[in-house]
Regions:
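Primarily membrane-embedded glycan-assembly and transfer machineries that use lipid-linked glycans
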Residues: 1-82, 104-236, 243-244, 248, ...
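Generic structural signal for short, solvent-exposed loop/turn connectors between secondary structure elements
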Residues: 76-80, 93, 268-276
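Aromatic-enriched
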Residues: 241-313
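Membrane-embedded alpha-helical segments of transport systems
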Residues: 92-95, 122-127, 257-258
């Protein structure tokens, strides 16, 4: 697309990645799209998701990230190797890859883990062949610059960052304190993912693959110190996975309210953080985290269908 005029290249980039994003949301919701409410509203809810407009305004990669993340998780059971390739293609977003290998190992998803690893190695090899080994020195230098200027010093604006690290810095905390707080959040997110994805876990009702997928996306946002407002686009597949897992019988009124708040929040997150110091995006991500964990832990505490049958016998 570098050969195209800028406006045309931008339109093609955003249009193609937006189409991928919508296709993935449709695939996630396919099992429940016969429901009247879902059939009427899913496309409108996905297309009008406020984070989508934030991403469009920045011309950024939120649609692609949401599409790859959602597709990789949707393909995990039927096409594990393809799932791994899709995870591997997310290597351009390394801050979102912190928990993915942990989840795959905890869940015993060896083929997906292998596929992701091979894809990342292949991409790294292709970059080296195309640009030479100096590309990695440039990458390391740019990473250091991004860490110092954009993250620690907040040159991008702490109100634009939607992470625990940024919240502490926005409230006047030092860099060391912000790293400690972020590390604590990352450890909690990691342990939650291991709990949810560990091999032999329950895969029925709301404790199924869809809820595990939603939790991984949400925990990824909690674990990363570098989450920009347009990155909240990946909440769309997380919300879709939760709806697919729990709709309609396992939703309570407060569940629906929480999902509605998460849907609206990206529209105001940056402005509210800048005006009041309240990290709305982070609060919504944390709220979704507790919602997913509540459903998961409730299902884990209930006897399985097989156990119930044995007890009845």
């Amino acid at each position: 697309m570098a050969l195209l005029p800028y406006s045309l290249a931008l339109a093609v980039w955003q249009g193609a990645s937006f189409a991928l994003y919508l296709a993935v949301i449709a695939a996630i919701l396919r099992p429940i799209r016969n429901d009247g409410t879902i059939a009427r509203l899913w496309l409108l809810a996905a297309a009008a998701f406020p984070a989508a407009f934030v991403n469009l305004g920045h011309g950024q990669n939120g649609f692609l990230t949401a599409g790859l993340f959602g597709a990789a998780l949707a393909m995990l059971a039927p096409r594990p190797l393809l799932s791994g390739v899709l995870f591997g293609l997310m290597a351009y977003k390394p801050q979102f890859g912190l928990l993915i290998p942990i989840a795959l190992l905890a869940g015993g998803q060896w083929r997906t883990f292998l596929g992701a690893g091979i894809t990342v190695i292949a991409l790294a090899g292709a970059a080296t062949l195309a640009f030479g080994p100096e590309v990695w020195r440039a990458f390391a230098a740019s990473t250091e610059t991004s860490r110092t200027l954009l993250l620690e010093q907040g040159n991008v604006g702490f109100e634009k960052l939607q992470s625990v690290f940024a919240a502490v810095r926005m409230w006047g905390g030092g860099v060391s304190l912000a790293y400690v707080a972020q590390a604590a959040a990352s450890v909690i997110a990691l342990l939650s993912v291991v709990y949810a994805w560990r091999a032999g876990g329950t895969w029925r009702a709301c404790g199924d693959r869809n809820l595990k997928a939603a939790l991984l996306i949400i925990a990824t946002l909690l674990a990363s110190p570098h989450v920009l407002d347009y990155d909240l686009t990946i909440l769309a597949p997380a919300i879709a996975f939760m709806v697919a897992s729990c709709w309609p019988d396992d939703f309570r009124d407060d569940d629906i309210s929480a999902l509605a708040a998460a849907w609206f929040a990206p529209l105001f997150a940056r402005a509210i953080a800048g005006a009041t110091g309240v990290p709305l995006g982070l609060i919504v991500v944390a709220m979704l985290y507790f919602l997913a964990m509540r459903h998961l832990m409730r299902d884990r505490s209930m006897p399985s269908i097989e156990t119930a049958r044995i007890a009845q016998a």
